[in-house]
Amino acid sequence: MPSMDIVSEVDEVELRNAVENSVRELKSRFDFRGKEASIEYKDHVVTLSAEDDFQCQQLVDILRMQMSKRSVDPASMDVDEKALHSGKTFSLKVRFKEGIETLIAKKLVKMIKDSKLKVQSSIQGDSVRVTGKKRDDLQAVMALARESELGQPFQFNNFRD
C-alpha cells in the first residue's frame, strides 16, 4: 500500500544561504548607506536590527525576497508583531515553523477525510502519515495539502509504493 508523510520543515542550508544573500544585499542598498542595520542568523532564529521600525520592515521584505529566490517558503516565517526598541536600534526576531502543530494537523486530517478520498491519515508526532490503495489518491492529497490555507507550508517525504 502506498504511503507518504506530510511534514513542515525548513531547509537549514538554503535558509542560511538566503540570510547571507540578504546581508550582501543590505550592504549594497542605497537606502541603508550610513545607517546601522544588521541581519544575524543563530539557532534557527534570524535577528533583524535597524535604526527605526520602518527599516526593520524593509529588512523583513529583503529576507522574504531572498528566501523565495532560494526556494524556501516565506510562509514558514513567524515574525514578531512589534519591533523591540533598545538604545538607538529596533530589532525584530524571525522564527521558523518546524513540524506540524497538533491543531493544524487535526485540521489537515479533517480536510483529508472530508475530501472523500480513499485514504487513511494519522497524526504521528509532528507529521501526518497518509496511506491509500492507489498512488493517484496520494497525489490528490498532495494537491489538497498544497491548496490548503492553514498558514504553514507542507513538504512530502517517505513516499513508498
Swiss-Prot record:
Role, per record: Nucleotide-binding protein.
InterPro entries: DUF520 (IPR007551), UPF0234-like_C (IPR035571), UPF0234_N (IPR035570), YajQ-like_sf (IPR036183)
Superkingdom field: Bacteria
Organism: Shewanella sediminis (strain HAW-EB3)
SUPFAM superfamilies: YajQ-like
One Pfam family of this chain: DUF520
Lineage: Bacteria, Pseudomonadati, Pseudomonadota, Gammaproteobacteria, Alteromonadales
Keyword Repressor: no
Record protein name field: Nucleotide-binding protein Ssed_3443
